[in-house]
Regions:
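Structured segments of extracytoplasmic/periplasmic soluble domains
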Residues: 55-67, 129-132, 185, 244, ...
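Solvent-exposed, polar/charged alpha-helical surfaces in well-ordered, non-transmembrane soluble domains
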Residues: 54, 58, 62, 124-127, ...
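Conserved, mostly hydrophobic/aromatic
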Residues: 60, 118, 157, 174, ...
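Catalytic-core regions of glycoside hydrolase
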Residues: 134-137, 158-160, 180, 186, ...
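Second-shell loop/turn segments in exported
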Residues: 39-49, 115, 160, 285-288
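Extended acidic/polar, glycine-enriched regions
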Residues: 75, 98, 105-149
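Acidic, contiguous N-terminal accessory segments
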Residues: 1-109, 139-142
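An acidic-aromatic substrate-binding cleft motif
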Residues: 138-181
């Protein structure tokens, strides 16, 4: 029987041991990597490209039982017999046609070249190479050219290791799964519901593995945007956060977590825990209030004063049960320079047979 939380040990295994099976991969055709090969990268590679090289080397050692050298590439060095990691800035001629930062192009011949639009794309290309070799159960890859880009971004994820607990190996594993952003519950600067967390350190560590960090707001929002002291209050919360942590990619706002004292008559007008006995109307966090756009514009303006390109994500699943007319009315009045996150089918009901509702 496992100990409590022993599953965490598996969550820290980025590369699976013993994937190589010579009885399987030797029957396939393609380019084979052996211990005469090297992994090379630009001499001025940034943290993400260096991480890509070292992660790929670890994959070959742990999963393929091969020990490859990783080193800076010399000018004019041939591509054959090497896995060359680069990006569009270093080798424009090898760049993918896509412009997305995480896009990449993989060329496989007598050598293997992975070129990303940015180093993040190169890293994702290395992950693709790892997945293909894992499927083949050996150090072999199909010859040819492959170009890929993410279907969408960001792909955010909470920690599966423990809420707001992000060991490096767990961040790396999430990146291997195609995630490109971490969500951290934020009650205040460097404070999560579970206590202190150095946000800037998390941002730094995540960035080195090609990941962004979003603040999932747990801030109290007791001020209506029309209150005279509302700007000063939200400056002391969201403004203080982005002033001190400009590396945050953005903020995610969910009704249940950021409810404010809306003046929409369809709601109680107060926070959930402040409801008076007998009040049957929903709290503002659970209704598409007409004044959410006012609140959003106030907070957004404060955040973007410190980070002009901050992604502002507004998530609407809390009022999915409300009639469509009210939900659409809110969407039509939201500012267009934010990201709207919706949860499809959450409140849909299906009737597979008479008397059964799911």
């Amino acid at each position: 029987m496992e100990r409590n939380y022993q599953f965490r040990e598996r969550l820290l295994e980025v590369h699976k041991k013993g994937l190589r099976d010579d009885a399987i991969w030797t029957k396939l055709t393609g380019t084979t990597v052996d211990e005469s090969w090297e992994i090379v990268y630009p001499a001025d590679a940034d943290r993400v490209l260096l991480h890509a090289a070292h992660d790929l080397r670890d994959f070959f050692e742990v999963s393929m039982n091969l020990c490859l050298r990783a080193r800076p590439r010399k000018d004019g060095e041939p591509l054959e017999g090497r896995i060359t990691l680069t990006d569009a800035a270093h080798t424009p001629a090898l760049a993918p046609a896509y412009t997305e930062p995480a896009a990449y192009k993989l060329d496989v011949g007598d050598g293997i070249t992975v070129c990303g639009t940015t180093p993040r794309g190169t890293l994702q290309g290395c992950f693709y190479l790892e997945r293909r070799m894992g499927i083949h159960r050996g150090p072999i890859i199909e010859r040819g050219t492959v170009e890929k880009k993410p279907l969408f971004s960001p792909r955010m994820v909470h920690s599966g290791f423990g809420l707001d607990d992000f060991p490096d190996a767990h961040i790396n594993a999430a990146a291997h799964m195609g995630m490109d952003a971490l969500l951290v519950f934020t009650k205040d600067l460097n404070i999560t519901p579970h206590g202190y967390l150095d946000f800037n350190n998390l941002i730094y560590r995540a960035a080195g593995m090609g990941m962004d960090v979003y603040a999932y707001s747990y801030y109290k929002s007791p001020k209506h945007p029309d209150d005279p002291d509302a700007p000063a209050f939200y400056e002391s919360t969201y403004g203080n956060l982005f002033k001190n942590c400009p590396g945050l990619r953005g903020v995610t706002l969910v009704g249940e977590s950021v409810e404010f004292p809306s003046r929409d008559p369809h709601t109680s007008g107060c926070l959930r825990l402040e409801k008076k006995p007998g009040e049957t109307r929903p709290s503002p966090g659970w209704y598409p209030c007409y004044d959410y756009p006012e609140w959003i514009n106030l907070v957004k303006g404060i955040i973007r004063k410190y980070k002009p390109d901050a992604d502002f994500v507004f998530w609407t699943y809390n009022w999915g049960y409300v009639n469509e007319e009210a939900r659409i009315a809110l969407i039509e009045t939201l500012p267009t320079d934010i990201s709207l996150q919706v949860t499809y089918e959450m409140f849909e009901q299906f009737h597979p047979r008479p008397g059964v509702t799911v």
